[in-house]
Amino acid sequence: MLVMSHVLAAVAWPYANGPRHIGHVSGFGVPSDVFARYMRMAGHDVLMVSGTDEHGTPIQVQADAEGVTPRELADRYNRVIVADLHGLGLTYDLFTRTTTGNHYAVVQELFEGMYRNGYIVSKTTMGAISPSTGRTLPDRYIEGTCPICGYESARGDQCDSCGNQLDPIDLRNPKSKINGETPKFVETEHFFLDLPALAGVLGQWLDTREGWRPNVLRFSKNLLDDLQPRAITRDLEWGVPIPLDGWRERGDKRIYVWFDAVIGYLSASIEWARRSGDPQAWRRWWSADGPGKDAPSHYFMGKDNIVFHSVIWPALLAGYSGEGSHDGQPGELGRLNLPTEVVSSEFLTMEGRKFSSSRRVVIYVRDFLERYDADALRYFIAVAGPESNDTDFTWAEFLRRNNDELVAGWGNLVNRSISMAAKNFGAIPPVDPAGLTEADETLLAVARAGFDTVGELIGRHRQKQAIGEAMKVVAEANRYLSEQAPWKLKGEADRPRMGTVLHVALQVVSDANTLLTPFLPHSAQKIHQLLGGTGVHAPMPVIEEVEDLDGGPAYPVLTGDYTVGARWESVPLAVGRALDPPKPVFRKLDPSIVDEELARLAG
């Protein structure tokens, strides 16, 4: 593996208009945590950041409907989402929000820097209003036929079928999603990102991307064929104010949510540094001319957000850094790194249907965690999630994976290995002085080889293959125990051999536990302790209530100390370390849960 001192894990920002369901976390949450945990275990200095995305039309419209302010709505769901992600054990160095003073300042700095460099321009365009109310009609609440692919339910800002960004006036047969009326289009002044002026630098950058998933790279390059200037402000009262003379005080114009949300990766890194006591520490992951010039950055999101991470965000970074056809000078933050890798997952469906809160085709993370263990969901996402193809979550398949693989495979190996050693020796047994057999050596070698194989696959974002390789070690160890049958070695003369077999089995349990720690951290900590280990093996995040650094109201963040924990290596077990009879690590689920959960879906 390449030696990397600093690694940025930038995770898509969940929108703060409701609790998260398992489809959300399958695409960005769990995969990013697996990657970050592995990288830390391998010795890298990881900064994993994200937060709740709290601006934009949907929140304002929902708040109006509920009779609350947008801030009150965002506050509510920020806390819910923080609790959801904490329950899954996602190890954010900082999970914050976009309504902080720090975020506003960073967004406005990038806006001003790009404006000075000529990559943000003002122009008059056509905006939609409701004929019946006279109010601005948000583009997200206009629906019609996509002019590019013909999809009949395209939104006014983006087509979910072909992924292209749109303007409401581009749609054929546009209708308001609020009341079904045809919008009226009137002139309005807005600021635009001059994407064509950045097409050259984007193309050169994309040509240097190696190891990207083919669909992501192909889609991104296709977007460059017809880049158009994109509006980055909206007729809206809720959002980041425009930081230019004559615009700051206006209450009817705000920076578009997609512009401010992607800047969150940078603002969260800066906030983390400020909170850590070293305000310039963020530069170790971001500064293209300084300490972060060789720092790789990995961005995690669902496929519907590829355009924002492979075109829009790189364009903002390049424009602010003074690159592109207009040239210019970097702003006060300096030249900033463009993404190293954009890791896009496909979609997770549920029982053959698209997730939908309104149609009750959903299971929220908080509800799942009330009934099942976090590692059961993390395991399903790792082995059967939407890494490279759309995947269907069914309760029958979840039950099978949990009972047949997690419980009967991994859980069985842990339980019987430790049980036999505790019963017959009360501790980690010694190896027979006569030495190891070929079977012993072979199994130990298989486990040791897993550190290279599994680690390399996680590093390349091939997590399905990675956990598959780790579970092969588990299967080999179960086969070894069945063939060696230590329970049959009952005589005094056989006791040294029994001890050797159980020592080898326990060593492989320890190694396999380390290999599975990025995927199954909750159970990994338990298994570490069952093996007589002490201290933190798999660190967990904590929720902290913090004050806004720039004078705003307090809010909860996810953070943690992840400098402790297991290393990515085989650690020899200490002979004589006491062992107690183990309790089952994983819960076997009753088949009746399938019908129970399907009944819940049916309402």
From Swiss-Prot:
<keyword id="KW-0436">Ligase</keyword>
<dbReference type="InterPro" id="IPR029038">
    <property type="entry name" value="MetRS_Zn"/>
</dbReference>
<comment type="subunit">
    <text>Monomer.</text>
</comment>
<keyword id="KW-0963">Cytoplasm</keyword>
<keyword id="KW-0067">ATP-binding</keyword>
<dbReference type="InterPro" id="IPR014758">
    <property type="entry name" value="Met-tRNA_synth"/>
</dbReference>
<feature type="short sequence motif" description="'KMSKS' region">
    <location>
        <begin position="354"/>
        <end position="358"/>
    </location>
</feature>
<comment type="similarity">
    <text>Belongs to the class-I aminoacyl-tRNA synthetase family. MetG type 1 subfamily.</text>
</comment>
<dbReference type="InterPro" id="IPR009080">
    <property type="entry name" value="tRNAsynth_Ia_anticodon-bd"/>
</dbReference>
<feature type="binding site">
    <location>
        <position position="146"/>
    </location>
    <ligand>
        <name>Zn(2+)</name>
    </ligand>
</feature>
<dbReference type="Pfam" id="PF09334">
    <property type="entry name" value="tRNA-synt_1g"/>
</dbReference>
<dbReference type="GO" id="GO:0005829">
    <property type="term" value="C:cytosol"/>
</dbReference>
<comment type="function">
    <text>Is required not only for elongation of protein synthesis but also for the initiation of all mRNA translation through initiator tRNA(fMet) aminoacylation.</text>
</comment>
<keyword id="KW-0862">Zinc</keyword>
<keyword id="KW-0479">Metal-binding</keyword>
<dbReference type="InterPro" id="IPR033911">
    <property type="entry name" value="MetRS_core"/>
</dbReference>
<feature type="binding site">
    <location>
        <position position="357"/>
    </location>
    <ligand>
        <name>ATP</name>
    </ligand>
</feature>
<dbReference type="Pfam" id="PF19303">
    <property type="entry name" value="Anticodon_3"/>
</dbReference>
<dbReference type="InterPro" id="IPR015413">
    <property type="entry name" value="Methionyl/Leucyl_tRNA_Synth"/>
</dbReference>
<feature type="short sequence motif" description="'HIGH' region">
    <location>
        <begin position="14"/>
        <end position="24"/>
    </location>
</feature>
<keyword id="KW-0547">Nucleotide-binding</keyword>
<dbReference type="InterPro" id="IPR023458">
    <property type="entry name" value="Met-tRNA_ligase_1"/>
</dbReference>
<dbReference type="InterPro" id="IPR041872">
    <property type="entry name" value="Anticodon_Met"/>
</dbReference>
<dbReference type="GO" id="GO:0005524">
    <property type="term" value="F:ATP binding"/>
</dbReference>
<dbReference type="GO" id="GO:0046872">
    <property type="term" value="F:metal ion binding"/>
</dbReference>
<dbReference type="InterPro" id="IPR014729">
    <property type="entry name" value="Rossmann-like_a/b/a_fold"/>
</dbReference>
<feature type="binding site">
    <location>
        <position position="159"/>
    </location>
    <ligand>
        <name>Zn(2+)</name>
    </ligand>
</feature>
<dbReference type="GO" id="GO:0006431">
    <property type="term" value="P:methionyl-tRNA aminoacylation"/>
</dbReference>
<dbReference type="GO" id="GO:0004825">
    <property type="term" value="F:methionine-tRNA ligase activity"/>
</dbReference>
<protein>
    <recommendedName>
        <fullName>Methionine--tRNA ligase</fullName>
        <ecNumber>6.1.1.10</ecNumber>
    </recommendedName>
</protein>
<keyword id="KW-0648">Protein biosynthesis</keyword>
<feature type="binding site">
    <location>
        <position position="162"/>
    </location>
    <ligand>
        <name>Zn(2+)</name>
    </ligand>
</feature>
<feature type="binding site">
    <location>
        <position position="149"/>
    </location>
    <ligand>
        <name>Zn(2+)</name>
    </ligand>
</feature>
<keyword id="KW-0030">Aminoacyl-tRNA synthetase</keyword>
